[in-house]
């Protein structure tokens, strides 16, 4: 199966990340040891869109993903990822801010 841009989806519905090409380290801190988790940049009703458009990164489990300074417990970190995801999508797919908002539901920049 492929997304509308021709990118092959994994069996779990993930297109290749447009935000991180090397998945061997944490996107935020660069950690290479310990558990690394996939993190969809836009969650909730947009989780499947994050997967389909490659708007996901790898985060270290104990720190940047679920730690007190991690994306799930720090609104500033979450907003930064949202902005970076929007910029990546606009560059990769040629979307305008309006096109992004129509697809994801909110403009983050």
Where are these regions (language model features)?
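Histidine-centered catalytic micro-motifs
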Residues: 36-44, 61-68
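Short linker/helix segments within small regulatory modules
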Residues: 42-56
């Amino acid at each position: 199966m492929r997304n509308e841009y021709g990118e092959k989806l994994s069996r779990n519905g993930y297109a290749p990340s447009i935000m991180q090409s090397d998945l061997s380290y944490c996107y935020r801190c660069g950690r290479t040891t310990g558990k690394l988790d996939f993190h969809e940049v836009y969650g909730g009703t947009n989780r499947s869109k994050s997967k389909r458009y490659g708007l996901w990164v790898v985060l270290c489990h104990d720190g940047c993903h679920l730690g007190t300074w991690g994306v799930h417990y720090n609104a500033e970190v979450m907003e930064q990822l949202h902005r970076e995801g929007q910029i990546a999508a606009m560059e990769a797919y040629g979307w305008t801010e309006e096109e992004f908002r129509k697809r994801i539901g909110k403009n983050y920049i």
